[in-house]
């Protein structure tokens, strides 16, 4: 029985002057787990770093197995797209696919914003003033997805930074930050492919929200992958030492995970899916509930220092 096994992590946020994530130590632990589990490849689901994390990018590229990136919104905060593609050694324009052990893995880049009618990639913070028109998959990529899935001889897995599964928050005056704005176009591509060939698109994995959640829609498994490092809170708290918050600009706007959260995912062609997650804990025992912030995000998902483990078998017909 043919299978593929990979390690996925998201939102490492290596930006030492801004966040206290001790990212080098986390990445080293992720590397060791990937070696111990004998995975076929490792993939970062975005927000690897917010500055110019060239040192850590080199360490990641030197893993003893294939490594891949998905662009996150913060990966181009201090770089142009051209600079980021070079720094991350990203194929093509930042979206691409690869095949491994009889599966096709498709990497999407939803980091686009509509500014005065122009669809532009996030870079150098250009999207910050436009919360209502950000997170878009351009038409070019929708076509790429349709063609890449349609031409695939293998079952497909999708990776993106933002969620395909979460519904957009269309409350007047509130930003569309819950999901990719044109997510329905992506869902339509998935459903059309699966109606022609059941099980053609089997799974979609995203980062970005720092949440642990799994949902099955129309026989597709959607995994909202937790951050490897921490959770952002809009209202700062005073539970960390002043020395720490003085050294790291936005440490007080985070609750931090002690463990480098990541998941080892195994897929078999017979429809078996296994996610081996992690149980973690909070740095200094400071949880989101202890801060002056809502306990859940807009989708009602709580902040935990875990990635769930699950084993299931999907039947496609």
Walk through the language-model features, giving the residues of each:
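N-terminal active-site segment of His-dependent metallophosphoesterases
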Residues: 1-55
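Short, flexible/disordered intra-domain loops and linkers
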Residues: 17-24, 168-181, 234-240
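Extended active-site neighborhood of metal-dependent phosphoesterases/phosphodiesterases
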Residues: 53-151, 182-201, 215-226, 230, ...
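Short, well-ordered beta-to-alpha junction loops that form the rim of enzyme active sites
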Residues: 110, 159-165, 207-209, 278-280
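Binuclear metal-dependent phosphoesterase catalytic core
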Residues: 189, 211-317
């Amino acid at each position: 029985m043919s299978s593929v096994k990979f390690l996925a992590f998201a939102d490492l946020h290596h930006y030492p002057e801004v966040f206290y994530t001790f990212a080098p130590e986390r990445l080293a632990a992720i590397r060791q787990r990937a070696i111990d589990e004998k995975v076929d490849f490792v993939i970062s689901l975005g927000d690897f770093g917010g500055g110019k994390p060239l040192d850590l990018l080199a360490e990641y590229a030197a893993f003893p197995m294939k490594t891949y990136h998905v662009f996150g919104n913060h990966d181009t905060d201090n770089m142009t797209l051209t600079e980021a593609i070079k720094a991350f050694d990203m194929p093509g324009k930042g979206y691409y696919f690869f095949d491994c052990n009889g599966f096709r893995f498709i990497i999407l880049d939803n980091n686009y914003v509509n500014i005065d009618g122009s669809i532009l990639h996030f870079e150098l913070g250009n999207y910050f003033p436009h919360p209502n028109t950000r997170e878009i998959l351009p038409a070019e990529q929708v076509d790429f997805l349709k063609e890449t899935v349609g031409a695939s001889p293998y079952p497909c897995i999708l990776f993106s930074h933002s969620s395909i599964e979460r519904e957009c928050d269309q409350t007047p005056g509130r930003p569309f930050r819950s999901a990719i704005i044109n997510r329905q176009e992506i869902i339509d591509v998935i459903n059309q492919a699966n109606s022609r060939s059941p099980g053609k698109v089997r799974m979609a994995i995203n980062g970005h929200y720092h949440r642990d959640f799994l949902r099955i829609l129309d026989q597709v498994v959607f995994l909202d992958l937790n951050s490897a490092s921490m959770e952002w809170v809009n209202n700062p708290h005073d539970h960390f030492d002043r020395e720490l918050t003085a050294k790291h600009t936005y440490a007080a706007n985070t609750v931090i995970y002690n463990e480098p959260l990541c998941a080892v995912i195994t897929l078999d062609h017979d429809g078996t899916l296994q996610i081996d997650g992690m149980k973690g804990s909070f740095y200094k025992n400071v949880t989101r509930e202890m801060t002056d912030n809502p306990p859940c995000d807009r989708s009602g998902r709580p902040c935990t220092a875990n990635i769930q483990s699950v084993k299931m078998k999907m039947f496609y017909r």
